[in-house]
């Protein structure tokens, strides 16, 4: 089944909802970055939450989410333009921890809690909007939920999950978000809290073949699906873009690349594509500066 996202409204409970499947795009990321299981789970949860957050706005603004909790996985980043395409990476892809009592992937241990979640929204204005909150658990879902409350004053349930095969392949990835509308009542809040108490893990539901629509129907029988968007893991890097980035290092550094290494090789951190530049290309760049 292809990856996609749906948006919906639940008028009877005064909330809006989002759900997504990201299994295939996470598998692409896993292969590109050689992710180990806990790193896959961390990046998958982050990309699912980022895609759903981007779907809350229909103007295709660029959104960059960065998480660094001081844990061994290092800095994590995901970037999307709200068009269903996303790219992302983790600082150390070879991270794997499990909780001794449950055997579950220990994303919170890998990410850490001594740091922050930052969201930058570039809406094409002079200055992008930037919101930053301290990490709560490092488990990603809790941290996005806290972000929505602290930065956007929107009470939200964020459930994201990943299942990884023993071979490291991705079995299931995705999630859902429930956001209360301003007119929500105490009864609405109580209903949602009760509904979440025994609700199955979203990764298990996706692994069983449940679609995003079916997951939302399990939560709210009367949900009205309002939108659908296909999702992809894609990088927009190119040799020209990397060359433009190289132009910022300065003439002296470029000259030393020519003198010492007779060129250079740059790896895109989002997709691991390697770009080689020979002496002639670097000299042309120096001449342009």
Roles of regions detected by a PLM:
Residues 196-289:
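Cys/His-clustered metal-coordination modules, chiefly Zn-binding fingers
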